[in-house]
Design a protein with these regions (language model features):
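Glycine-rich phosphate/diphosphate-binding loop of Rossmann-like nucleotide-binding domains
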Residues: 80, 85-105, 157, 163, ...
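Solvent-exposed alpha-helices and their adjacent loops that cap or buttress functional pockets
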Residues: 61-66, 102-103, 128-130, 154-155, ...
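N-terminal ligand-binding/catalytic initiation module
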Residues: 2-161, 394-408, 415
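Short, ordered loop/turn segments at secondary-structure junctions
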Residues: 75-77, 85, 114-115, 140-143, ...
């Protein structure tokens, strides 16, 4: 192990262990200093909101923290780049997600790690506790089970259920890609797209890109066996949706003349020779973490006309889910949405991409550690520390919830405009 990696490892362990173990805690929102305070907080006073909620369940939003509480739930079957290490090992990641909810959107989140033998057991467990929360964020659940789990929970719960590994990735990817194509003078409807990877993130990304205007026949998805095509008999129902009727079978064949490469697979799977075959002014989003499908220096050495994005903060155009999930939940919770639908996702895409075209405030430049940012090849998507994301994305999402009929409360006219 290199000294640098050892130092990072020790720093990370110390960060999680000190001064107290973990990254989140419970805070009180009411005084609890006197006998009267305690009588109101618990017995006998607590009986009054209990009666109100029993008579009208919607009053749980008035008398409890339900409306600002999200469950971050995992079974630990797809932990970051580490794989299936089980529920308990996923707890630091889920606590980290809860930290991000609080830091970026003021949302209280609690991590829940579920041990189960079947997907149905997981679904039943989450559905049974769903009334406690205003929303559910599913995390680090492997494909294809994640698709079944999310869809079943959306059907059974009357609160937003959102698998961030799918839809958060898709929203941020779509926002960045639409902007990158604009910079390159291209339209998504005319663009040939190669997607390396066919798991949860890849599938959601391509589905959302189609809803944003991409043509299905222009999408070429690859898994470990090569191109996903209509002649294959080994495809599950989720991959079958992207089976292209094509004679092409390899990456080198499908990338010849491609406008876009989206990588959600693994490190170093895109050779420089493939980049050289792409159409003029290509876009490469190599989003595998911590190491991308091709390093930016290698790609730029082959093509001076490309736009490059990765999942890393040390390169331009970071494709990071934190640009989306805190704010889409903020808008959904404030509108008391029953679900997060396509209209809300597309509203988030447009809000995120629109922000990248505006002048960048000095405080954002300082937080990003740069002296200048302007819409163009090295800046097609906002920086995660941009405080404008909260009002812009949350407002767009909440308004879309109202307009699409899934909101259950009216929004103030000046919501998130202050």
């Amino acid at each position: 192990m290199s000294d640098q990696r050892h130092d990072l490892r020790q720093q990370a362990l110390d960060y999680h262990a000190q001064p107290v173990p973990g990254k989140i805690a419970i805070a009180l929102t009411k005084p609890a200093e006197t006998a009267r305070d305690l009588a109101l907080a618990y017995s006998p006073g607590v009986a009054e909101p209990v009666r109100e909620i029993a008579a009208n369940p919607a009053d749980a939003y008035r008398y409890t923290g339900k409306g600002n509480l999200v469950a971050v739930i995992s079974n630990g079957t797809a932990i970051l780049g580490l794989g299936n290490l089980g529920p308990l090992a996923s707890k630091p990641v889920m606590e980290g997600k809860a930290l991000l909810f609080k830091r970026f959107a003021g949302i209280d989140a609690i991590d829940i790690e579920v041990k189960h033998e079947t997907s149905q057991q997981f679904i039943d467990t989450v559905a049974a506790i769903a009334d406690t929360f205003g929303g559910i964020n599913l995390e680090d659940i492997k494909a294809p089970e994640c698709f079944e789990i999310e869809q079943a929970l959306i059907a059974r719960c009357d609160i937003p259920v959102f698998h961030d590994d799918q839809h958060g990735t898709a929203i941020v990817t779509a926002a960045g890609l639409l902007n990158a194509l604009e910079v390159q003078g291209k339209q998504i409807g005319d663009s040939r797209i190669v997607c390396m990877g066919a798991g949860a993130a890849a599938t959601a990304c391509m589905e959302l890109l189609i809803k944003c205007g991409a043509k299905p026949h222009n999408i070429f998805m690859l898994d470990r066996q090569g191109v996903i095509h209509s002649g294959r008999t080994d495809l599950n129902q989720y991959k079958q949706r992207f089976a292209n009727d094509t004679p092409l079978r390899t990456l080198m064949e499908v990338i010849d003349g491609a406008d876009v490469f989206v990588g959600v697979s693994g490190p170093d799977v895109l050779p420089a020779e493939a980049v050289a075959l792409m159409a003029a002014n290509p876009v490469i989003f190599a989003c595998s973490n911590p190491d991308p499908e091709i390093k930016p220096a290698q790609a730029h050495a082959v093509r001076g006309d490309l736009i490059m994005g990765t999942g890393r903060s040390d390169y331009p155009n970071q494709i990071n889910n934190v640009l989306c999930f805190p704010f889409i939940f903020r808008g959904a919770l404030d509108a008391r949405a029953s679900r997060i639908n396509d209209a809300m996702k597309i509203a988030a895409v447009e809000a995120i991409r629109g922000l990248a075209k505006e002048p960048v405030p000095a405080e954002v430049l300082t937080a990003a550690g740069v002296s200048e940012l302007a819409f163009g090849k090295d800046y097609v998507i906002p920086k995660p520390m941009d405080a404008r994301l909260l009002p812009r994305v949350a407002r767009a999402v909440a308004l879309a919830a109202v307009e699409s009929g899934v909101a259950r409360v009216a929004l103030p006219a000046d919501y998130m405009l202050g």
